[in-house]
From Swiss-Prot:
Protein species of origin: Nicotiana tomentosiformis (Tobacco)
Reported function: DNA-dependent RNA polymerase catalyzes the transcription of DNA into RNA using the four ribonucleoside triphosphates as substrates.
Record keywords, A-Z: Chloroplast, DNA-directed RNA polymerase, Nucleotidyltransferase, Plastid, Transcription, Transferase
Gene Ontology biological process terms from the UniProt entry: DNA-templated transcription
UniProt-listed HAMAP family: RNApol_bact_RpoB
Predominant location: plastid
Gene3D superfamilies for the chain: 2.40.50.100, 2.40.50.150, 3.90.1100.10, DNA-directed RNA polymerase, beta subunit, external 1 domain, DNA-directed RNA polymerase, subunit 2, domain 6, RNA polymerase alpha subunit dimerisation domain, RNA polymerase Rpb2, domain 2
Gene coding for it: rpoB
GO cellular component terms listed in the entry, alphabetical order: chloroplast; DNA-directed RNA polymerase complex; mitochondrion
Recorded catalytic activity of this chain's protein: RNA(n) + a ribonucleoside 5'-triphosphate = RNA(n+1) + diphosphate
UniProt record similarity statement: Belongs to the RNA polymerase beta chain family.
Protein name as catalogued: DNA-directed RNA polymerase subunit beta
EC class name: transferase
Length: 1070
């Protein structure tokens, strides 16, 4: 619980609550709704009827545990059983059976699903809400054209537009337009009914010509005209039943189904009272929409803001899973229908269990979790990453936008985002503004709208009442901003406060305020809420910081931050990284892998996570926090997880930093560090890599795992056990064999080596015909083997291979090339590691740990790091930790600066160190050069900020190529570290080389080292024998490719050679 002295205490909702509520809604309501839609199925003679009994469905508890599902690469799911009856109409007999129709993946306590052993999470999607929206655009003459766009529940669009002559046209899927009268008549109305149900009948009559009267003379004529325009069919189509069915299927079902949300929006926008269960577009809707369009043409009514959140809806986990379940039932219906017909045709007696198969449901969910863009692999770099991933909101995905086509207006911040979508936390790059993050107090309402909480201000009641308002409701209230929270209640009536009303910011008297914010963090996401002094930072740098905190690597020795915001504990609790006591009891036994808790007459075993690999190769490990014999309360922390300390999030380290230049080593965001950070393992982290190999059954026989591998040196096989698998605890280096494997192959007599043929002829020894296909350790993979898993699945077929996985632990100290960052977007690369005696040192003799460039602060406008830096120094000297809510200027002016200076002054007094706070230059201190012992000319800001080590590490990035593969078409080296590719020399690199006049290097880059096939073959030979490298005479392959491509366009390219002797032009073919 967090609160302010003058406000009611508000509890921050669970950060995974959005996922839990969505999945529970799917299980409670979505399953039943879709099962009720399953139709009764009859055979062609209508003698047999198949019917589901929805009330009796049941979900069975999973047969395996979560850990086993991850270990064995299985899906953590529940079996769904449904009862059905087969009714013979002639005899009125019914056969009822309960059968299994498929597996539904379940959600675990982290808000994720485990599919094939992989943690996956479903992202919430923002879509345009179904309904009608009015907007105006300027035509080529500069005249406003008003249109009304009707969006169906499936995303189909139809438009109504009014022209300069006040004629109303309907445009379906951007094709030819038809008159509104033809559309209304095709939907079943005659002319009299149309004129009776509109507000402006004279306008409708004004564009009713004789030709138009003939088109709407009867419903059949209107349908034919509409079909001709809609389907772009030439000639004169004839009215028929099949034509009506085609029109019904292509137009009315796809573009006229509004759904419950669409019907509600349509009724509100057009002031209609059509029942909610009538979810299709009616002629009454079309006529009311046309009336509103006419009103807009003559200056009555308001246009819609398409980017307002009241016109958006959230497609949550429940909606996505329900859609997939409905799709699976449609497939199941087709299977049942086909099976019934087949059984009757072959004169077999069907049973309900024989008619139904579990394949449609199981395969539908497998393909959804594996292939759908909104189903993503959970990012588990650190605990914060896990929570934030589940709270993302995406405009992308099926039915949504794309990064290439989305406009700036859609990406921009909208006033309706206040308290619902974080204005800071979004992706960088092409998806900026399209992938956002939920504000910490936001929740998804019943109708798919984002709701935000407010306190109601009432004169009658002194109590505090909290309301959750949708985006369409809060714009009718005067909402006081966050800086009015701490006003004195005795004089509130006399004060003037800033407020928000109808997307505008006003300054009004306190008595006019209806609602007020409940919390300073209300409008931020979790990532942005963890940045102290965020109000002093530029928003771009805050965005970088909220993204970079998710890239922080869990360190071997975590440390909680001195300066925080207070949300660190809540983030750690909801991340699932901690081991929490589920009940009261006493600890009777502790070990590195489990805790035994005695209580209520039995003993509960709580397993701990030990050296578990995340999908980003970071190490997830739980450390015991309770001694044996201690009594535990329910909810108490038993063990800390990765990147947590004492139940609080701990992503980095508090290190001593100076802001000053140092010999150019920290220019352009480079960072200079002390060797203390290496030798004392301050920034040491553990990483676990997984290596995997499968054994198949080939056409020549099964592959064999063995430690007897011919033609391999003994030292490469030294770590294998008798089964041919590396032993636990072994230290392995690059090139070592992890799993020995032989694959059988057919070898012809002629392909044997001479010595093998001799052995066969003289001694009769059968030479091995197997090929060595061992699992070898790749470059940069050296480390300690901590786990080996041999997963054997039932049936040793080639489709179900055995899998052997080897997990290797690496210990990585911080080194040159690693990336570090603060919490204010101040990131940098380690440029040099200095001996601690050469680092600048303070007046008390302590050497600095890091040196940052001061030029990185003023231009980036992230001054919050200076406040954090100085307050961190005071906290380390006073042994205090600070938890500061953002926007503390609401208490008084310059509140942040006063707090920092007062703490520095107190630290100076208590520690008797006057250099900590010097009035001439507060916050700065004179420090000394470690190499000479002389003081620097200017005082320098020193402090203890919280610095993170990011996952962008030099061990994963650095790469060199001596030889490798070439692309077949261009004959140039492949691209990328994974393919052992080469460096690409682009235009700008060539310019740089040209600037220095290095002609030979340029020639090598364009020929030998790139795509000149003959020249690079000759280089090897001349290098070996020591001759001079010949100059290439013909063109490289890329030039030859260009010539061929031009020839494919019927362009012949020739070139001319100018003789040096007589300058005669000799023409040669390319």
């Amino acid at each position: 619980m967090l609160g302010d002295g003058n406000e009611g205490i508000s509890t921050i909702p669970g950060f995974n609550q959005i996922q839990f509520e969505g999945f529970c809604r799917f299980i409670d309501q979505g399953l039943t709704e879709e099962l009720y839609k399953f139709p009764k199925i009859e055979d062609t003679d209508q003698e047999i009827e198949f019917q589901l009994f929805v009330e009796t469905y049941q979900l069975v508890e999973p047969l395996i545990k979560e850990r086993d599902a991850v270990y064995e690469s299985l899906t953590y799911s529940s079996e769904l059983y449904v009862s059905a009856g087969l009714i013979w109409k002639n005899s009125r007999d019914m056969q009822e059976q309960t059968f299994f129709i498929g597996n539904i993946p379940l959600m675990n306590s982290l808000g994720t699903s485990i599919v094939n052993g992989i943690y996956r999470i479903v992202i919430n999607q923002i879509l345009q809400s179904p309904g009608i929206y009015y907007r105006s655009e300027l035509d080529h003459n500069g005249i406003s054209v008003y249109t009304g766009t009707i969006i169906s529940d499936w995303g189909g669009r139809s438009e109504l537009e009014i022209d300069r002559k006040a004629r109303i046209w309907a445009r379906v899927s951007r094709k030819q337009k038809i008159s509104i009268l033809v559309l209304s008549s095709a939907m079943g109305l005659n002319l009299r009914e149309i004129l009776e149900n509109v507000c402006y009948p004279e306008i409708f009559l004004s564009f009713l010509s004789d030709k138009e009267r003939k088109k709407i003379g009867s419903k059949e004529n209107a349908i034919l005209e509409f079909y001709q325009q809609f389907a772009c069919v030439g000639g004169d189509p004839v009215f028929s039943e099949s034509l009506c069915k085609e029109l019904q299927k292509k137009f009315f079902q796809q573009r006229c189904e509004l759904g419950r949300i669409g019907r509600r929006n349509m009724n509100r926008r057009l002031n209609l009272d059509i029942p909610q269960n009538n979810t299709f577009l009616l002629p009454r809707d079309i006529l009311a929409a046309a009336d509103h369009l006419i009103g807009l043409k003559f200056g009555m009514g308001a246009l819609d803001d398409m980017n307002h959140l009241k016109n958006k809806r959230i497609r949550s986990v429940a909606d996505l899973l329900q859609d997939q379940f409905g799709l699976a039932l449609v497939r199941l219906e087709n299977v049942v229908r086909g099976t019934i017909c087949g059984a009757i045709r072959h004169k077999l007696i069907p049973t309900p269990q024989n008619l139904v198969t579990s394949t449609p449901l199981t395969t539908t969910y497998e393909s959804f979790f594996g292939l759908h863009p909104l189903s993503q692999v959970l990012d588990r770099t650190n605990p914060l990453t896990q929570i934030v991933h589940g709270r993302k909101l995406s405009y992308l995905g099926p039915g949504g936008l794309t990064g290439r086509t989305a406009s700036f207006r859609i990406r921009d911040i909208h006033p309706s985002h206040y308290g619902r979508i974080c204005p800071i936390d979004t992706s960088e790059g092409i998806n900026v503004g399209l992938i956002g993050s939920l504000a910490i107090h936001a929740k998804i309402g019943h109708w798919g709208s984002l709701e935000s909480p407010f306190y109601e201000i009432s004169e009658r009641s002194t109590g505090v009442r909290m309301l959750y308002l949708s985006p369409g409701r809060d714009e009718y209230y005067m909402v006081a901003a966050g800086n009015s929270l701490a006003l004195n209640r005795d004089i509130q009536e006399e004060q003037v406060v800033p407020a928000r009303y109808r997307q505008e910011f006003l300054t009004i008297a306190w008595e006019q305020v209806h609602l007020r914010s409940i919390f300073p963090f209300q409008y931020f996401s979790i990532g942005a809420s963890l940045i102290p002094f965020i109000e002093h930072n530029d928003a771009n740098r805050a965005l970088m910081s909220s993204n970079m905190q998710r890239q922080a690597v869990p360190l071997s020795r975590s440390e909680k931050c001195i300066v925080g915001t207070g949300l660190e504990r809540q983030a750690a609790l909801d991340s699932g990284a901690l081991a929490i006591a589920e009940r009261e009891g006493r600890v009777v036994y502790t070990n590195t892998d489990k805790i035994l808790l005695a209580g209520n007459g039995d003993i509960l075993s709580i397993p701990l996570v030990i050296y578990q690999r995340s999908n980003k190769n970071t190490c997830m490990h739980q450390k015991l926090q309770v001694p044996r014999g201690k009594c535990i309360k329910k909810g108490q922390i038993l063990a800390d997880g990765a990147a947590t300390v004492g139940g609080e999030l701990a992503l980095g380290k508090n290190v001593l930093v100076a802001y000053m230049p140092w010999e150019g080593y920290n220019s352009e965001d480079a960072v200079l560090i002390s060797e203390r950070l290496v030798y004392e393992d301050i920034y040491t982290s553990f990483h676990i890599r997984k290596y995997e190999i499968q054994t198949h059954v080939t056409s020549q026989g099964p592959e064999k795992v063995t430690n007897e591998i011919p033609h391999l040196e003994a030292h490469l096989l030294r770590n294998l056990d008798k089964n041919g698998i590396v032993m636990l605890g072994s230290w392995v280096e690059t090139g070592d064999i992890l799993v020995g494997k032989l694959t059988p192959q057919v070898v012809k007599e002629s392909s044997y080596a001479p010595e093998d043929r001799l052995l066969r002829a003289i001694l009769g020894i059968q030479v091995s015909t197997s090929k060595e296909t061992c699992l070898k350790l790749l470059i940069g993979g050296r480390g300690r083997v901590i786990d080996v898993r041999w997963i054997q699945k039932r049936g040793g077929s080639s489709y179900n291979p055995e899998t052997i996985r080897v997990y290797i632990l690496q210990k990585r100290e911080i080194k040159v090339g690693d990336k570090v960052a603060g919490r204010h977007g101040n990131k940098g690369i380690i440029s040099k590691i200095l001996p601690r005696q050469d680092m600048p040192y303070l007046q008390d003799g302590r050497s600095v740990d890091m040196v940052f460039n001061p030029l990185g602060v003023p231009s980036r406008m992230n001054v919050g790091q200076i406040f954090e830096c100085s307050l961190g120094l005071a906290g380390s000297l006073l042994d205090r930790h600070y938890r500061i809510a953002p926007f503390d200027e609401r208490y008084e002016q310059e509140a942040s600066r006063k707090l920092v200076f007062s703490e520095l002054y107190e630290a100076s007094k208590q520690t008797a160190n006057p250099w900590v706070f010097e009035p001439e230059y507060p916050g700065k201190s004179r420090i000394f050069d470690g190499r000479t012992g002389n003081p620097f000319e200017q005082p320098v800001i020193i402090g203890k900020p919280y610095i993170l080590k990011l996952i962008h590490q030099v061990d994963d990035k650095i790469h060199g190529r001596s030889s490798g593969h070439y692309a077949l078409v261009t004959q140039q080296p492949l691209r990328g570290r994974a393919k052992q590719g080469g460096q690409r020399v682009g235009e700008m690199e060539v310019w740089a080389l040209e600037g220095f006049g290095v002609a030979h290097i340029l020639q090598e880059m364009l020929t030998y080292k790139s795509d000149h096939i003959r020249a690079r073959q000759e280089v090897l030979g001349t290098t070996i024998i020591g001759g001079t490298i010949p100059n290439p005479e013909d063109a490289p392959e890329s030039f030859r490719l260009l010539v061929r491509e031009l020839r494919s366009l019927a362009l012949e390219l020739n070139h001319f050679l100018v003789s040096e002797k007589n300058f005669q032009i000799n023409r040669k073919e390319a």
